[in-house]
């Protein structure tokens, strides 16, 4: 990718979506299908959330561990 094309992709979101260039390459080619199915980054499991949120006073179905869903925050 030339410098001109790179700058154009920074400034133009439509061109960016059409461009297949990415500095890291195509990471999905490097991962096996089994590895792709096991990716769960940036989250906690449901059981961990339920175990931690109930003692904090959150009796809802699913909530974050932080207290934004608790009645005391409303």
Swiss-Prot record:
GO MF annotations in UniProt: signaling receptor binding
Any single Pfam family the record assigns to this protein: Lantibiotic_a
One record GO biological process: killing of cells of another organism
GO cellular component: extracellular space
S-S pairs: none
Modified residues ((Z)-2,3-didehydrobutyrine): 48
Keyword Secreted: yes
Beta-methyllanthionine (Thr-Cys) crosslink site(s): 45-49, 64-69, 66-73
Residues carrying 2,3-didehydroalanine (Ser): 47
Main location: secreted
Secreted is among the record's keywords: yes
Post-translational modification: Maturation of lantibiotics involves the enzymatic conversion of Thr, and Ser into dehydrated AA and the formation of thioether bonds with cysteine. This is followed by membrane translocation and cleavage of the modified precursor.
Modified residues (2-oxobutanoic acid): 43
Subcellular location field: Secreted
Keywords per UniProt: Antibiotic, Antimicrobial, Bacteriocin, Lantibiotic, Secreted, Thioether bond
Cross-link Lanthionine (Ser-Cys): residue positions: 53-63
Propeptide positions: 1-42
Known role: Lanthionine-containing peptide antibiotic (lantibiotic) active on Gram-positive bacteria. The bactericidal activity of lantibiotics is based on depolarization of energized bacterial cytoplasmic membranes, initiated by the formation of aqueous transmembrane pores. When present individually, LchA1 exhibits activity towards B.subtilis L1 (IC(50)=9 uM), Rhodococcus sp. SS2 (IC(50)=9 uM), M.luteus B1314 (IC(50)=1.2 uM), B.megaterium VKM41 (IC(50)=1.8 uM), S.aureus 209p (IC(50)=3.1 uM), B.pumilus 2001, B.globigii I, B.amyloliquefaciens I, M.smegmatis 1171 and M.phlei 1291.
UniProt protein name: Lantibiotic lichenicidin VK21 A1
């Amino acid at each position: 990718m030339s410098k001109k094309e790179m700058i154009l992709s920074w400034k133009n979101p439509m061109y960016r979506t059409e461009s297949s260039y990415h500095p890291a390459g195509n990471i999905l080619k490097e991962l096996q299908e089994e590895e792709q199915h096991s990716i769960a980054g940036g989250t906690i499991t449901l059981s961990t959330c339920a175990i931690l949120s109930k003692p904090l006073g959150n009796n809802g179905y699913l909530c974050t561990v932080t207290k934004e869903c608790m009645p005391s925050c409303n």
